Amino acid sequence: MGYLVKLFKLVVWMLVIGLFSIPSLVSYVIFYDTVIPHSVIQYPVYFNYTTGLNFPTAEVRLDHFSIDPRLPGTSLLQIKMPHSPRNSAMGNFMVSVDFQDRNQRSLKQVKRTVLLPHRSPIHEYLKLIVCSPLYFMGILEETDIVNVRLFESETFAKSFNSITTLSVRFSVKNTPAQAIVKIYSKDIEFYEATLAFASKLHGMRWFMYTHKVSAFLVFTSLFWFTGITSTIITYLIVSSTSETKATRR
């Protein structure tokens, strides 16, 4: 008989643990989705070479901008360029990006000087000899990828209107809606360009994003313990109230 009582208690405890584990998991998912923004988002940049323009210009629609504009972030313009004599002889050139809101008002303007990485002729010849089989097979390409750092640890917004709990799409007054990208050179040759944004996480956000398993165990246990404690306290209060009423009767 004692064995059955112990087994019954074990089953009850397992049911309690199971019942409180589901809300704990759901709570952590909601908490993670609310606290952690999308870390990186990229947009392709398509430049316009229409006759009459002095330099290549692109209008990038920042649809579904899921980076929290209140958090410090980094923005990069990545340009994939062929390692051609024309690009090598071009020297320095300027890049500008104008971030605008939905009403086409400028939020932030950035201008940067860009220079292709220099390589000596000896370095180029040695690389061509060593990597020639990979070039013939199409595994390697004679390209240069230039990363133009537009800004770092800066924010678009200082105040916000509302945040939706189950989404990382923020209704923020100064959220960028588009970016006007200009390259002040008609001599440049490139394959493609990408505008990228990345959130810079600190403190708890950094811990939750970089240590996902540990954060999951810690916060899920915390939510589970909170649920169990609240239930026990509520049960004790209700039981004591019921006993008091029964005694008065």
Curated annotation (Swiss-Prot):
Domain of life assignment: Eukaryota
Species assigned in the record: Schizosaccharomyces pombe (strain 972 / ATCC 24843)
GO biological process, one term: lipid droplet formation
Any Pfam family matching the protein: Seipin
InterPro entries membership: Seipin
CC annotations in GO: endoplasmic reticulum; endoplasmic reticulum membrane
Protein family per UniProt: Belongs to the seipin family.
Record's protein name: Seipin homolog
Acetylation found in the keyword field: no
Taxonomic lineage: Eukaryota, Fungi, Dikarya, Ascomycota, Taphrinomycotina
Lumenal-facing ranges: 32-212
Entry membrane topology: Multi-pass membrane protein
